[in-house]
Amino acid sequence: AGRNVHPIAVSGQFQLGGITVTTGSCGHAWGGVWFHLDVADGLFYSGDISMESALFRFDVPPPAGLALVDASYGLYNVSQRQQWDKLRARLTLPALCPVPPSGRAVELALLLAREGRTDIALDAPCLEMLRQMAAHNDGSLHQDVEAELQQLLRTLPAFSAQSSLILAADPDGQSGMAGELRRRKDFHHRTLFTGHMNRLNHQQWLAGEVDFCRWNVHPTLKTLMLLVSMLKCSRLVPMFTHVEDIQDWQFAPGCHIVTQNMLRVDLCH
């Protein structure tokens, strides 16, 4: 009560204290957006972004002089196509993939369905997200996937713990259906993480108890270079990463790399 809440469009504009804010689909997840503020020579804030998704679209942003950009993977530069070949090989044995319902759950199911896989099970939260996406594109999805999502929804088998491939929340693999299945003594699927692993998951991976194969949901170096070209930015702030040697990040002529500490000092003055 008393909150002044206004939903914003995935792709659109709104006014914030006299500043025009433009939004666009970020390519990372359902409903995810980037922000562009029409101030000075433009300020771009990416949030989580990806340009490699087969499901989620990435809207080209307006030019911006200063860009605060998702660099979660650092200078990692392995393409999604290469990762898909690796991941596909891991999915030949019974596997449980702990996934976020609004992100790669539906995308992985869609890609596997395109290859004729019919032994895929989605838990209730993942299936509900598929229903929402198949019913209405809020601007997050590529325009040509709606019919495929509807077909996938019609043909997916009922959830079963015996399915060869199970896509289930939560992505940490400790809660939700994924956590419940892993605690069952009669469940023997191999757990395969495709995204961020917390400390426990990382320890389990080092011990050989679980598998890991990254599914790109953040920018590779190639994507960062493409984004800088789109934005024509003169200053880039790599976020969600540790910049050890700033010289390694000077990958775009005319674009100065700014660390978050340097930016903080800049703003204070």
Regions found by a protein language model. Give the residues of each.
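Redox- and metal-dependent alpha/beta enzyme cores, enriched for Fe-S-associated oxidoreductases
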Residues: M177-E209
